[in-house]
Regions:
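Conserved SF2 helicase motif VI
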Residues: 368-389
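The feature captures the C-terminal accessory region of ATP-dependent helicases
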Residues: 69, 78, 89, 101-102, ...
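Conserved strand-helix element at the start of the C-terminal RecA-like helicase core
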Residues: 108-119, 284-310
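Conserved Walker A/P-loop ATP-binding site and its immediately adjacent core
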Residues: 97, 105-128
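Conserved helicase ATPase core of P-loop NTP-dependent helicases/translocases
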Residues: 322-344
């Protein structure tokens, strides 16, 4: 019988003998002590992804009202060859804590992040903290922080790693989840991973992220000395306890400390909108603007952003690091945007702090849970007394999710084919340019294996949404669970709540008429016609698709169920007897 971590919690006994556990020759904990430590880690560490790393190293978990600097000793800086992970929510003070640590180290520092806007903001904060100066926005992009501090993007580091090879320094990897998040459209993550693995002895590393779930296995792999396969298998404690002991026995890591914080998302209210109904979304944002609310709008598709720009009017937009440098620097400097709305893509979804009490509406159009959390985190709130924020998320249909799976699986197919034969990358270059890069040192193409990891994570998440094809609002429910809320979708969560009420009213009136009728074929046809009108006029039923043909009784009953009517219509079968004439 396998013993799970749930069994450990309830002290359920196991039929496995002690002999199956392979412990280190000189373990830090004996078997019984390790079992108790597992219980302690489960109780104290809410993030499943972080538990294994907490088990094998040291860790501290702060409360939802603390800031990360309250639990980190600024002198507790990793030694050369070692690392630490700071995994805490957006707005918990990770940047401030890092700036304090930089002041306490004698090592040269390289700070990296993945977006120009986030880089400008770090420079502003560092200069303010170290020199007490407010730097003009137009200088942030080009300013230097001094001889011992270099602040660059991951993309810049990836192209200049030769400058730092063999040199001793402290490397601060902010927004480290980007190594997975960006791997599908860029090869820089693959280059960074290779640089880290090749230079572990001469650099100290601090990893920072607000979304550790997907990237934690990547960090564990980079920092692993031995037992990598067993460790990665045991990182999800839904596996049996034996595998955790095996992993503990063989896994050695350079990661010495994990800092994390509890989250409190009670200040966030989620609402759902139809991704194809731009007018409905724009009308809602306009109404909120009229009430004095600002909105941050994240879109995957620039063309949709342009449509929203035109409809909303009073709107800033940033779709590229290169074409809006002055505007990016100004937002980083002021920690707010000037217009009522800011429409953006991945340019501003990471690392940017927006301290603006009028920013109380966020729209996030994505199927990626990492991106979603990062965008929501741009609006900074007081951790002790947060203001209420409304977040609009798309109510993706099963068709939308299925299309996303098909697209990701097609990309995965190309990745695996190129992995087997890198020369195929030329064939796929137009469709998927981030598959490989040419390594001038080894003089052959290098496959972007991080893209494979990113796609595997994405596909697993999307497939999880389709476990029950009949389950409506699967993505929205997953988001609610991600934020520790009950996965219950109520009518008032929809932007089209008025249409839902209209649909239910029309369906109820049609059913009441039928209920009080003779219930013959003519009455049934009348009911079907009225239900079709209720569905087609409100676009609430069947993902808004129009009902054009004659509907069957099964569809009638499904519509009644959707309208909250607890009745079914069943055909009465008449039997005609035969007798002799």
């Amino acid at each position: 019988m396998m013993r799970t971590i749930k069994d450990l919690k309830s002290k359920t006994s196991s039929m496995e003998s002690d002999g199956v556990y392979i412990m280190p020759f000189n373990p830090k904990y004996e078997k019984d002590e390790l079992e108790e430590r597992m219980l302690k880690v489960v109780e104290e560490q809410p993030s499943v992804a972080l538990r294994f790393l907490c088990l094998i190293g040291d860790y501290k978990v702060g409360t939802s009202k603390q800031y990360i600097s309250q639990i980190i000793d600024s002198n507790d800086i990793p030694s050369l060859g070692e690392s630490m992970l700071i995994a805490s929510p957006t707005g918990s003070g990770k940047t401030s804590a890092v700036i304090k640590m930089i002041k306490h180290t004698s090592m040269p520092v390289i700070y990296v992040t993945n977006r120009k806007m986030a880089l400008c903001q770090f420079k502003k904060d560092d200069i303010k903290a170290s020199k007490g100066l407010d730097v003009p926005a137009e200088l942030l992009d080009s300013i230097s922080l001094g001889e011992n501090i270099i602040a660059i993007t991951y993309q810049e580091l990836a192209e200049t790693t030769y400058k730092y090879k063999g040199k001793k320094h402290l490397l601060i990897l902010d927004e480290v989840h980007c190594l997975l998040e960006d791997a599908n459209f860029s090869v820089y993550a693959e280059k960074i991973i290779r640089y880290l693995k090749a230079n572990r002895d001469n650099i100290a590393r601090i990893y920072l992220t607000a979304t550790p779930d997907a990237v934690t296995p990547v960090i564990a792999e980079i920092e692993c000395e031995s037992g990598q396969e067993q460790a990665l298998f045991a990182m999800d404690w839904d596996t049996n306890v034996k595998s955790v002991f095996h992993a503990y026995a063989s896994y050695k890591t350079r990661l010495k400390m994990v800092y994390s914080m509890e989250s409190n998302w009670n200040y966030i209210n989620f609402k759902l909108y139809t991704p194809d109904d731009t007018k409905e979304l724009a009308d809602y944002i306009k109404r909120e603007n009229e009430q004095g609310t600002k909105s941050l709008i994240y879109v995957n598709d620039i063309s949709k952003g342009k449509v929203l720009q035109e409809v909303l009017g009073n709107t800033q937009h940033i779709y590229s690091d290169e074409d809006k440098r002055a505007e990016i620097a100004e937002i980083a400097q002021n920690e707010k945007f000037s217009d009522r709305n800011l429409i953006t893509t991945k340019v501003a979804e990471n690392g940017v702090s927006l301290h603006d009490d009028e920013l109380n509406l966020i729209v996030v159009e994505t199927l990626d849970p990492i991106t979603l959390k990062q965008v929501i985190g741009r609006a900074r709130v007081n951790r002790k007394n947060p203001r209420e924020i409304t977040v609009l998320i798309p109510d993706y249909s099963m068709t939308d999710i299925g299309n996303a799976i098909a697209s990701a699986e097609q990309q995965m197919k190309m990745v695996k084919e190129v992995k087997a034969d890198p020369d195929l990358a030329l064939e796929y270059a137009a469709k998927y340019p981030a598959l490989v890069y040419y390594d001038s040192k080894v003089k052959h193409p290098v496959v972007n294996t991080m893209a494979e990891k990113a796609l595997a994570y994405q596909i697993a998440f999307l497939r999880g949404l389709r476990k029950d094809p009949e389950k409506p609002h699967a993505f929205a429910q997953a988001v609610l669970e991600l934020y520790g809320k009950k996965p219950v979708i109520s009518d008032d969560m929809f932007l089209y709540y008025d249409r839902i009420l209209d649909f239910k009213t029309k369906a109820a009136e049609a059913f009441d008429t039928y209920k009080n009728s003779e219930k013959n074929a003519e009455c049934l046809d009348s009911l079907k016609a009225k239900l079709k009108v209720a569905c087609n006029s409100t676009k609430v039923y069947n993902d808004g698709k129009q009902l054009t043909s004659n509907i069957q009784i099964s569809t009638v009953n499904d519509i009644l169920k959707a309208a909250g009517i607890a009745y079914e219509i069943k055909a009465k079968v008449e039997v005609f007897n035969i007798s002799s004439v």
